[in-house]
């Protein structure tokens, strides 16, 4: 039996992820008028652009919801965000500037917690506002069915009847007004925004054109650091981790991770830290473009990775980055709770994060411009006395290094012979324009 319902299941309970915006408001009212029994579920994700969460379920009841619930997802979302930092679960970067997968993290939490709440109410059909071209339709599909094996999916935006009647925002606004709700469309922005406590995503409309830069975006978690008229004074901040977990900012310890993330957002946001412009590959392998904000995630990530590089050895760090990139892809694809992702998460949290205890002090300036001012940890394997250029007792001698050079580089002869072979077969040229060793000339001299 198919899990996707193409038309409205009349007379049945349908859970809708209700944001209170025009789209979900019109969808809820339309479903009720057509004979379905809608239940509204609103996720409190700590969205920085949402002022009154309690009002959203009340509006849902006015529009015809059989019941409306507000589900506080902030604690779980911050926990997953910290886990992503511990694992470096980020795969989209441009010139070293990172997208912190804040929307995929939000979908992982929303998709599981809302469907779990629906299941408690005996609601086994789920609808949301994701479209067929995006990533979210697949993320919600996976997380929903992971949480409730009996779940069926109904999306108004895949229903031709709904699209024919209410296919655009103008039609939806008129529909709400005719029903007596006087819903007015908000002023159209040049892009769309989706946000949660971890970050904000700005995309679509004008941002689909690559000649529209970050300068058209009005940040909701930070400042327009690119505007010279915006004053952004430099600021020092100290971040403390204990066993991989952020616990303090500027000497203030937080027992509540949500409050710590909010403060990290405030600190990083004052500088526009963590804002990035990315061209990425969607799940369906088509490229999209987004401008992202994540001031708190960026702040914690910088401090965490500084401690990682000072505490762990080279091979461990290399594996951390490789696993993190793969895990970031799983997260992006809606597979954050799949076994292959859990395996990588466990490895990083068990063997890497557990050793990360210490403090990092940063000086934040404008945007992603910062300096590391100090790094302190009892677990540091950085020992300056081992490599000091000053005279004194040393842990190894010149003779030790001579032996190391000999043993570590026994393959030089083998490498030289391979280069000679490459020249003979025409793979390498002895042209003066190449940066490769002039092995052809060297071979001639050797033979003479």
From Swiss-Prot:
GO terms for molecular function: argininosuccinate synthase activity; ATP binding; protein homodimerization activity. CDD domains: ASS. ATP binds at residues 17-25, 43, 129, 131, 136, 194. Its EC number is 6.3.4.5. It is found in: Cytoplasm. Its main location: cytoplasm. L-aspartate binds at residues 131, 135-136. The keyword Amino-acid biosynthesis applies. It catalyses: L-citrulline + L-aspartate + ATP = 2-(N(omega)-L-arginino)succinate + AMP + diphosphate + H(+). GO terms for cellular component: cytoplasm. Keywords: Amino-acid biosynthesis, Arginine biosynthesis, ATP-binding, Cytoplasm, Ligase, Nucleotide-binding. L-citrulline binds at residues 99, 135, 139, 192, 201, 203, 280. One of its GO terms (biological process) is urea cycle. HAMAP family: Arg_succ_synth_type2. PANTHER family: ARGININOSUCCINATE SYNTHASE (PTHR11587:SF2). Homotetramer. This is Argininosuccinate synthase. The lineage of its organism: Bacteria, Pseudomonadati, Pseudomonadota, Gammaproteobacteria, Enterobacterales. The gene is argG.
């Amino acid at each position: 039996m198919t899990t996707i319902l193409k038309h409205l299941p009349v007379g049945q309970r349908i859970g809708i992820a209700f944001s209170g915006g025009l789209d979900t408001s019109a969808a809820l009212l339309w479903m009720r008028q057509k004979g379905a029994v809608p239940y509204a579920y609103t996720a409190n994700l700590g969205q920085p652009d949402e002022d009154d969460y309690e009002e959203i379920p009340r509006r849902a009841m006015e529009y015809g919801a059989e019941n409306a619930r507000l589900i506080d997802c902030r604690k779980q979302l911050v926990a997953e965000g910290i886990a992503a930092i511990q694992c470096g679960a980020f795969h989209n970067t441009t010139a070293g500037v990172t997208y912190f997968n804040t929307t995929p993290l939000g979908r992982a939490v929303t998709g599981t917690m809302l469907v779990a709440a629906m299941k408690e109410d005996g609601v086994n059909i789920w609808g949301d506002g994701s479209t067929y071209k995006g990533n979210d339709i697949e993320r919600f599909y996976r997380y929903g069915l992971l949480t409730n094996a009996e779940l069926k999916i109904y999306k108004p935006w895949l229903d031709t009847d709904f699209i024919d009647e209410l296919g655009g925002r103008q039609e939806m606004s008129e529909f709400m007004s005719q029903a007596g709700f006087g819903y007015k469309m908000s002023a159209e922005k040049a892009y769309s925004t989706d946000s949660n406590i971890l970050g904000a995503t700005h995309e679509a409309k004008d941002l689909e054109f690559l000649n529209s830069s970050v300068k058209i975006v009005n940040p909701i978690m930070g400042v327009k650091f690119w505007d010279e008229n915006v004053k952004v004074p430099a600021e020092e901040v100290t971040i403390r981790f204990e066993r991989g977990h952020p616990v303090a900012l500027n000497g203030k310890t937080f027992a509540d991770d949500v409050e710590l993330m909010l403060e990290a957002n405030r600190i990083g946001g004052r500088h526009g830290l963590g804002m990035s412009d990315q061209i990425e590959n969607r799940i369906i392998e088509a490229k999209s473009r987004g401008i992202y904000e994540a001031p708190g995630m960026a702040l914690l990530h910088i401090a965490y990775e500084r401690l990682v590089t000072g505490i762990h050895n080279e091979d461990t760090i290399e594996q951390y980055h490789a696993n993190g990139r793969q895990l970031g892809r799983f997260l992006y694809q809606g597979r954050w709770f799949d076994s292959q992702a859990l395996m990588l998460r466990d490895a990083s949290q068990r063997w890497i994060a557990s050793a990360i205890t210490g403090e990092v002090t940063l000086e934040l300036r404008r945007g992603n411009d910062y300096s590391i001012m100090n790094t302190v940890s009892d677990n540091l394997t950085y020992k300056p006395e081992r490599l000091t250029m000053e005279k004194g007792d040393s842990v190894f001698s010149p003779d030790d290094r001579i032996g190391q050079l000999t043993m570590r580089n026994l393959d030089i002869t083998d490498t030289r012979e391979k280069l000679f072979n490459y020249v003979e077969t025409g793979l390498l040229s002895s042209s003066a324009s190449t940066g490769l060793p002039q092995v052809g000339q060297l071979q001639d001299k050797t033979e003479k």
